Curated annotation (Swiss-Prot):
F-type ATPases have 2 components, CF(1) - the catalytic core - and CF(0) - the membrane proton channel. CF(1) has five subunits: alpha(3), beta(3), gamma(1), delta(1), epsilon(1). CF(0) has four main subunits: a, b, b' and c. Key component of the proton channel; it plays a direct role in the translocation of protons across the membrane. The keyword Oxidoreductase does not apply. Keywords: ATP synthesis, CF(0), Chloroplast, Hydrogen ion transport, Ion transport, Membrane, Plastid, Thylakoid, Transmembrane, Transmembrane helix, Transport. It comes from Illicium oligandrum (Star anise). This is ATP synthase subunit a, chloroplastic.
Length: 247
């Protein structure tokens, strides 16, 4: 019987399939480390845009704001209102953190639709929005997790951990699991939405390359803005929750 050779061949086939990587990636070898070059390149571009915008905003401030200064002041006021609504009266120290998260994600998401990443050729893979990669979204979610633990411990000391046995100690495992799943939900929600948006646009452009994809691209810009707002709102809400101790 050829059962054993067939089984071995089947296992080999499954192993080869499991080794297939979805998409290609371009890496830099720095010392003994592999660095994901695609994410770094696009992230540096986004950071450069943000730093350039900040430099323009503070270059020549006027007592009576001009159009450009009005815009940047509106953005700052929006972030302050968002932080105050979710965190409460002690929101002040957290405005830079929430603002950085919101602006980086917002510009990253929009860069995927507005910047012509595809014209830059790489040896492997292609450039896309930084938030199109799970490494970026996890890297954004983990500091958020650290931030709300830090906020709670700073405000309440070791008494912060008392929330895990409220309203009853029976809920201890669930309360612990809830805190450690927050960064997972933040990262996968952002990654999934941005990846799906870019894939839909790519498929439509390949099928109908003229007019039809344009409304979808505008819809993508809108949903990208909403995703940045959701991430920043949840980050601020988690920080406020850890400081106030309510659910």
């Amino acid at each position: 019987m050829n059962v054993l050779p067939c089984s071995i061949n089947t296992l080999k086939g499954l192993y080869e399939i499991s080794g297939v990587e979805v998409g290609q990636h371009f890496y830099w070898q720095i010392g003994g480390f592999q660095v994901h070059a695609q994410v770094l390149i696009t992230s540096w571009v986004v950071i450069a845009i943000l730093l350039g915008s900040a430099a323009i905003a503070v270059r020549n401030p006027q007592t009576i704001p001009t159009d450009g200064q009005n815009f940047f002041e509106y953005v700052l006021e929006f972030i302050r209102d968002l932080s105050k609504t979710q965190i409460g009266e002690e929101y002040g120290p957290w405005v830079p953190f929430i603002g950085t998260m919101f602006l980086f994600i917002f510009v990253s998401n929009w860069s995927g639709a507005l910047l012509p990443w595809k014209i830059i050729q790489l040896p492997h893979g292609e450039l896309a929005a930084p938030t199109n990669d799970i490494n970026t979204t996890v890297a954004l979610a983990l500091p958020t997790s650290v931030a709300y633990f830090y906020a709670g411990l700073t405000k309440k000391g070791l008494g912060y951990f008392g929330k895990y046995i409220q309203p009853t100690p029976i809920l201890l495992p669930i309360n612990i699991l809830e805190d450690f799943t927050k960064p997972l939900s933040l990262s996968f929600r952002l990654f999934g939405n941005i990846l799906a948006d870019e894939l839909v646009v790519v498929v439509l452009v390949s099928l109908v390359p003229s007019v039809v994809p344009i409304p979808v691209m505008f819809l993508g810009l809108f949903t990208s803005s909403i995703q940045a707002l959701i991430f920043a709102t949840l980050a601020a809400a988690y920080i406020g929750e850890s400081m106030e101790g309510h659910h």
